[in-house]
C-alpha cells in the first residue's frame, strides 16, 4: 500500500457515513474507524491495537499487505493478508448493503493449538462523547468529569457498543466469533461475553487512567483444538456498524 487508503460505508439517513482508514505502522496495516459528517469532516472513533513483530498470537491479525478493489454494487472491498510465527491470516472487509458499516470475514491457517486468535480495538482518547450518569461513573470520578466514553453491552445484538455525541458504534459477533471487553487498567479485569452476565458493570475510560478494549475472539478455533487435527483453517465473521443519534 502507498500512504493512507480507505473504505467507506453507505450513506446514513442524516447524510454521514463511516470510513475505515488504513495506514502502515511498522510492518502492520493498522486501521481506524471514523465518522464522516455530511460535510465530510472526520472524527476518529476507535482504532485497532496491533501486536509486536515477535508475537506469535498478536492482539489483532498481523496484516502486512492490503489491496482495495471494486466489487460490483457493494462498491469496494479491502483484502488483507499477513503472517506471524507459523500461522497465516487473511481478512476481507466490505460495506454492508443494508446498514451503515462493514462486515469482516477473517481466516487463519494454524499449524497447532492457537493462543489468542482475534481482534482488539480501543476508543481513541479525546474523541467527543456524552457524559455518563453518575451511577455509571467509576468510583471517585464525578459524572461531570466523564467527558469520555466506554464500551457497553449492546441491548439487541451479541456484541458491544460505544456511544458518541453523534451516534453509536457497535461491534457485533457473527459466525464463529464472540465479543467481550477487557480492561487494560486492572489486573485480570474482564467483562464476560455478551448475554452471559445480565446487568454487567459498564467499563469506561476516565481521564486516561483506565481503558477498556473491545475484543472479538475466534471461538471456531475451540472446535479445532478439540479434534487435535492440524494444520487447520479457522474462520470467523463480525460487523462494525454505526447507528446515528436520533436527536
Model features per residue range: what roles?
Residues 18-22, 31, 63-68, 73, ...:
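Generic structural motif
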Residues 50-115:
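Extended, loop-rich substrate-binding clefts of extracytoplasmic carbohydrate-active enzymes
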Residues 1-52, 159-185, 242-246:
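Beta-strand-rich N-terminal accessory domains
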Residues 101-150:
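Acidic (Asp/Glu-rich), glycine- and aromatic
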Residues 90-99, 118-129, 182-187:
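Extended Gly/Ser/Thr-rich low-complexity repeat segments
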Residues 133-135, 143-179, 186, 217-223:
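Long, charge-dense
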Residues 13, 84, 97-99, 164, ...:
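Surface-exposed coil/turn segments at beta-strand junctions on protein surfaces, enriched
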Residues 48-49, 83-85, 111, 115, ...:
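Beta-strand-rich recognition/accessory modules
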Amino acid at each position: 500500500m502507498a500512504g493512507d487508503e480507505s473504505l467507506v460505508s453507505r450513506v446514513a439517513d442524516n447524510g454521514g457515513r463511516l470510513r475505515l482508514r488504513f495506514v502502515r505502522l511498522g510492518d502492520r496495516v493498522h486501521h481506524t474507524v471514523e465518522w464522516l459528517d455530511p460535510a465530510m469532516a472526520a472524527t476518529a472513533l476507535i482504532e485497532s491495537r496491533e501486536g509486536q513483530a515477535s508475537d506469535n498470537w498478536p492482539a489483532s491479525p498481523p496484516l502486512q499487505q492490503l489491496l482495495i478493489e471494486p466489487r460490483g454494487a457493494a462498491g469496494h472491498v479491502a483484502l488483507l493478508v499477513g503472517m506471524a510465527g507459523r500461522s497465516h491470516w487473511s481478512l476481507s472487509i466490505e460495506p454492508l448493503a443494508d446498514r451503515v458499516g462493514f462486515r469482516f470475514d477473517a481466516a487463519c491457517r494454524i499449524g497447532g493449538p492457537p493462543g489468542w486468535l482475534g481482534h482488539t480495538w480501543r476508543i481513541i482518547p479525546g474523541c467527543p462523547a456524552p457524559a455518563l450518569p453518575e451511577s455509571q461513573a467509576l468510583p471517585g470520578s464525578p459524572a461531570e468529569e466523564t467527558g469520555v466514553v466506554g464500551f457497553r453491552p449492546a441491548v439487541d445484538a451479541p456484541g458491544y457498543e460505544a456511544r458518541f455525541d453523534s451516534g453509536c458504534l457497535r461491534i457485533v459477533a457473527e459466525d464463529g466469533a464472540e465479543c467481550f471487553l477487557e480492561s487494560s487498567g486492572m489486573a485480570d479485569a474482564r467483562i464476560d461475553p455478551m448475554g452471559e452476565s445480565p446487568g454487567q458493570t459498564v467499563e469506561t475510560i476516565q481521564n486516561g487512567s483506565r481503558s477498556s478494549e473491545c475484543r472479538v475472539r475466534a471461538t471456531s478455533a475451540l472446535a479445532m483444538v478439540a479434534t487435535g487435527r492440524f494444520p487447520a483453517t479457522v474462520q470467523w465473521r463480525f460487523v462494525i456498524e454505526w447507528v446515528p443519534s436520533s436527536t
